[in-house]
């Protein structure tokens, strides 16, 4: 029904565009037809998106439901965040982006708040056969095999989970979680979002962090000021304090 509504034959809508943020755009609608088009779309349960100073459409890659590299269920998380924040009024636009793994197909660090799936691993010696497949799978050079024992340099590990996925004997204990970045921009100004907590291990903590970030922006931003510039102006130390408080609370 949603697809039929988007075809828009009754209103003679011939132009449709899939936007970079995974929405459907219908250009060239005459002003007098706008309400009729909205009503026709509503019959198929298609709701208008948003623009302006508010939380925008939350975007996500396909995640572990489709992609073998995926570390998290991106779709259900995007739906939950959408239900929680979509169209929330703020001093300026605020974008969420969710990507399932370190391949970063959705480029999470370009968003005001980016979420990247990750897997924290711990070697389980009892099930290891010393084949060295995990060493070859690790692109960060974080894993070494010496005298039949695996060592992991935690400072190099980026939580990609390749070692765990490649292991033929499942010799790894794993925790699926999230790498969260803040303050990304990719437009007139470009900035790579930065992490504060290396790895967030459960969704409840993730949601608390998201709430803290959105609330910080709502309470401190000036009109038409993007999140990155609010953090810079108010002070990164104060922002980090709020995020750590939410994480530890």
Language model feature labels by segment:
Residues 1-8, 13:
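Single conserved hydrophobic/aromatic residue that forms the stacking wall/gate
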Residues 10-15, 41-49, 172, 217:
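A common structural junction motif
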Residues 14-20, 51-52, 91-94, 145-146, ...:
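Flexible, glycine/charged-enriched surface loops at secondary-structure junctions
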Residues 29-34:
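Helix N-cap motif at beta-to-alpha junctions
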Residues 45-58, 84-99, 155:
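Immediate flanking context of iron-sulfur cluster ligation sites
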Residues 92-120, 236-244:
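A gly/ser-rich beta-alpha-beta helix-loop segment of oxidoreductase catalytic cores
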Residues 133-152, 162-178:
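Iron-sulfur cluster-binding cysteine motifs and their immediate structural context
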Residues 177-179, 184-221:
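A hydrophobic, small-residue-rich beta->alpha segment in the mid-to-C-terminal subdomain
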